[in-house]
Amino acid sequence: MGTKAMTPPVGTTAQRPGGVDEEFNTGCLRFNSTIGALEYYNGSLWIQPGVQEYSTVSSSFSAASGLVYFVNTGGGQVTATLPASPDLGATITFYDIGKTFDSNNLIVSRNGRPIQGDNANLTVNTEGAAFSLCYSGSTYGWRIFSI
């Protein structure tokens, strides 16, 4: 291949491929000229490699690997359901954005996988809590690895 560079397909956000196309698959890589960055298709979304995705939630939700969630339980308890079939090393981060976990808990539903080696859901009731869970395999499941 030498020392030259490879030029990926280039197009705007509006020109992203989609639908039924034999050249459009999970893992497709392109340069998006609208945002001035590389992006790849993960099977459901176009994502920029190395860029963290954030989501603000205030009601129960299904958590996705690789995302950071700003959770507001000001309106009542929120349940975050972990992925049923996580990949080894999958990571999910939660922040108590409203500082209300002490009055309205965050419940992390294990979805059949252990949390810290226990077969029980995780109840978070510490105001201002911020933590990440990383999937370590079937024995210990999801582990808290940063607080």
PLM regions and their residue ranges:
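Exposed extracellular interaction/assembly regions and N-terminal maturation sites
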Residues: M1-G11, L45-S109, S138-I147
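A broadly tuned "polar low-complexity/structure-edge" signature
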Residues: T3-G18, F131-L133
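Short edge-strand/loop segments of extracellular domains
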Residues: S109-D118
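Short, solvent-exposed loop/turn motifs
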Residues: R30, L45-W46, P114
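Short hydrophobic/aromatic-rich beta-strand motifs
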Residues: G18-Y41, G66-N72, D87-G98, A120-V124, ...
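A sequence-level detector of short linear motifs
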Residues: Y40, I47-Q48, Q116
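Short, solvent-exposed loop/turn segments at secondary-structure junctions
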Residues: Q15, Q77-V78, Q116-G117
